[in-house]
Amino acid sequence: MSILKCLGVRGNQLCAARNYLKVLGFSSFHTAPNSSIEIQTQDEEVVIALGSNVGDRLHNFKEALKLMRKSGIHITRHASLYETAPAYVTDQPRFLNSAVRADTKLGPHELLAALKRIEKDMGRTDGIRYGPRPIDLDILFYGKFKVRSDILTVPHERIWERPFVMAPLMDLLGTAIDSDTVASWHSFSGHSGGLNALWEKLGGESLIGEEGMYRVMPVANGLLDWSRRTLVMGILNLTPDSFSDGGNFQSVKSAVSQARLMISEGADIIDIGAQSTRPMASRISAEEELGRLIPVLEAVMSIPEVEGKLISVDTFYSEVALEAVRKGAHIINDVSAGKLDASMFKVMAELDVPYVAMHMRGDPSTMQDSENLKYDNVCKDISSELYSRVREAEISGIPAWRIIMDPGIGFSKKTEDNLAALTGIPDIREEISKRSLAISHAPILIGPSRKRFLGEICSRPSAVDRDPATIASVTAGVLCGANIVRVHNVKDNLDAVKLCDAILKQKSSPIKFKQ
């Protein structure tokens, strides 16, 4: 249903109205919900806010998104996920908030009716205004139009006063305006600087972590606020041919012993890999990978020390990812960002676990070929190529709040490229922010541990002698904005990470002067 339908135009008025709207670009109109006729038209882009504070909030979001898709609402972008303190009525549980951009042929009142139907089907009842609810769905924007009726006001009239609405809304935009529709949304703010200026007036990014609002990632039946400290991911290779420790942990007993050691040394995450991704590595089948992985994964998941820790599985096979999550894995770490298995994104969309998308050209056997080592601008090229993979993942149904990005240190890069990527994390975020603020806010994982470029710089041909260089590279990466570090030597790198976090915390704290 089109916007013209809601205007109530008929007969020979139709062409004139269409031409008028084309010239106008966007419009404001007043309409009653029943003043319409049925006509077909192109999709309108909309923004819908989501909130929940009753029951399983994450499940409520997933169910609402599924029902929205079934109702003719094609979701194209997701905001980050926020846990927020309740507003207005404060004696109630904390909320999860987010928002989505979507395309729909539904007219504004049809869209409203569809969302109200979803709310009702999910158990929402008429109760206290601003009170507890399993799901709350609000239309923030509808195309280029302002809508005024007895039951609907668009843009939503309280967008501008609510940080828990503005933060997800800003996530759905980029710092660059990507369409006339987005330009109209900025114009609706009433500020010369658009929505960006309005968000900054409210407090902008300084509000995140303050005022009871936290950007979070759902994982292992909890919510992870990765801004509080840097996480350490310990590497557990089950392969006979990994470049650093191949063959050391092929038995279940030795693998479990190594997992216990890394946990005792302070690892937050254990990343289990059963397929080598070193340069020139030969690929094994999913069946062979599962044969190596599952006995160890089951054994590690059963040890008491794993309580409170996260288990990641390093794989580019969707079949392996599916079985790993069934066995209890909390994260899937894919060095190919979905390029080596066409089913990966579809499977991950159903698994509801965080997904690490890494930048790599080619595959492990070809990534160091000359054609894969040519960059015009390393950080810009990584940003563009990685963002294109993440966008495909998002369109496939993996929400931005489950994405972790990895610039791919040591993969399809020369030594100088690795250094540029390691210290260029702010540039990578900035480039991605032009297209999507949500994706630019995603956690960034780096994995420089014992990589060849460190050996080249420090003249350390043996990988096991590169731990001091690894510590230095981890330090550089964390100080430049990395949120997760993937390392072989947990103990020493954890010390480096703690120092970096202390430096960053002191740097971000306001300076107080004695009177």
Curated annotation (Swiss-Prot):
Region: HPPK, residue numbers: 47-172
GO CC terms of this entry: mitochondrion
UniProt-listed PROSITE patterns: DHPS_1, DHPS_2, HPPK, PTERIN_BINDING
pH dependence as annotated: Optimum pH is 9.
Protein name (Swiss-Prot/TrEMBL): Folate synthesis bifunctional protein, mitochondrial
EC number: 2.7.6.3, 2.5.1.15
Entry binding sites for (7,8-dihydropterin-6-yl)methyl diphosphate: 277, 314, 333, 406, 451, 486-488
Transit peptide: first to last position: 1-28
Residues bound to Mg(2+): 237
One term of GO molecular function: ATP binding
Cofactor: Mg(2+)
Residue span of region DHPS: 232-515
Family: In the N-terminal section; belongs to the HPPK family. In the C-terminal section; belongs to the DHPS family.
Entry keyword set: ATP-binding, Folate biosynthesis, Kinase, Magnesium, Metal-binding, Mitochondrion, Multifunctional enzyme, Nucleotide-binding, Transferase, Transit peptide
